[in-house]
Amino acid sequence: MFRTILYHTMLVGTFLYGMIFRYPALWFMGGERRYNYTSKIAKRWGKNMVWASGSKVEVVYNDSYAEIENIKEDNEAVILISNHQSNIDIPVLIGYFPLFFSFVAKKEMATWPLIGRWMRSFDCIFLDRKNPRQGMKDMKQAIEKIKKGHSYVIFPEGSRTPDGSVQEFKKGSFKLATDTGAKIVPVTLIGTYDVQSRKS
């Protein structure tokens, strides 16, 4: 119970703190400077949220650490394809994966109080799943951002798993990679469902 209260208090508190003390600085920034500034803040936020949950993260590379280092040095845009077990997947990925990246998310999240505003400043892409025409425009925007060198996380299951198992991948999940030629980096999250399942 204590950890749950601490986690949600920090979640709201850090967003409020960011809006008051960090977000105004973005008014004087643009382009890559804005993106890098927000990404650095997000990395600290991710680790703080994992700490608040009482969890520990171990990053295991499957013979790909050198490749990740090369991606960092070359500032290469990649598409991270990850399973989606829990809301805590977001801070885990942001805090512990050694790259700057944003997320491909559903359109509705752009209007969420506090979180939506930070996601927009974080250069997230919002896809309209219900409007195919708008969805195509969103995809074109995403392609341009990837060509600029920005990496993105995609949850190909479309939403969090209801039972901890990997769900069927949605059609079009790999379209960004195929249309841009960006390298795909697979990521497997293990144990986050036990920390915070969809039902909790």
What is each stretch, according to the model?
Residues 114-117, 147-153, 162-200:
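A cross-family acyltransferase "interaction/gating" segment
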Residues 1-59, 117-118:
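A transmembrane-helix-recognition feature enriched in membrane-embedded lipid enzymes
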Residues 77-79, 151-155:
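Residue-level preference for the first positions of well-ordered beta-strands
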Residues 139-140, 146-148:
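Cytosolic, positively charged, low-complexity intrinsically disordered regions immediately flanking transmembrane
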Residues 6-10, 42-105:
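Conserved H-X4-D acyltransferase segment
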